[in-house]
Curated annotation (Swiss-Prot):
Its cofactor is FAD. It comes from Daboia russelii. This is L-amino-acid oxidase L2. Keywords: Antibiotic, Antimicrobial, Apoptosis, Cytolysis, Disulfide bond, FAD, Flavoprotein, Glycoprotein, Hemolysis, Hemostasis impairing toxin, Oxidoreductase, Secreted, Toxin. Belongs to the flavin monoamine oxidase family. FIG1 subfamily. N-glycosylated. Monomer. This is in contrast with most of its orthologs, that are non-covalently linked homodimers. It comes from the Eukaryota. It is found in: Secreted.
Length: 20
């Protein structure tokens, strides 16, 4: 993702805010 925005589309590839 571009920014650490959990409100945006979650990309479970290289993000931490993504749980599943």
């Amino acid at each position: 993702a571009d920014d650490k925005n959990p409100l945006e589309e979650c990309f479970c590839e290289d993000d931490d805010y993504c749980e599943g």
